Swiss-Prot record:
Sites of the Cyclopeptide (Gly-Asp) crosslink: 1-31
Family from the record: Belongs to the cyclotide family. Bracelet subfamily.
Listed GO biological process terms: defense response
Keywords: Disulfide bond, Knottin, Plant defense
Post-translational modification: Contains 3 disulfide bonds.
PROSITE patterns, A to Z: CYCLOTIDE (PS51052), CYCLOTIDE_BRACELET (PS60008)
Disulfide partners: 5-21, 9-23, 14-28
The protein's name in its UniProt record: Cyclotide cter-J
Key word Cytoplasm present: no
Domain notes from UniProt: The presence of a 'disulfide through disulfide knot' structurally defines this protein as a knottin.
Function: Probably participates in a plant defense mechanism.
Length: 31
């Protein structure tokens, strides 16, 4: 998880998770 997906995951999971993004430090990242 090094590239931010432009989405936060403080209250809800990453919607961009369908694109391979994961939550890290309250922000969604993708490798």
């Amino acid at each position: 998880g090094t590239v931010p997906c432009g989405e936060s995951c403080v209250f809800i999971p990453c919607i961009t998770g369908i694109a391979g993004c994961s939550c890290k430090n309250k922000v969604c990242y993708i490798d």
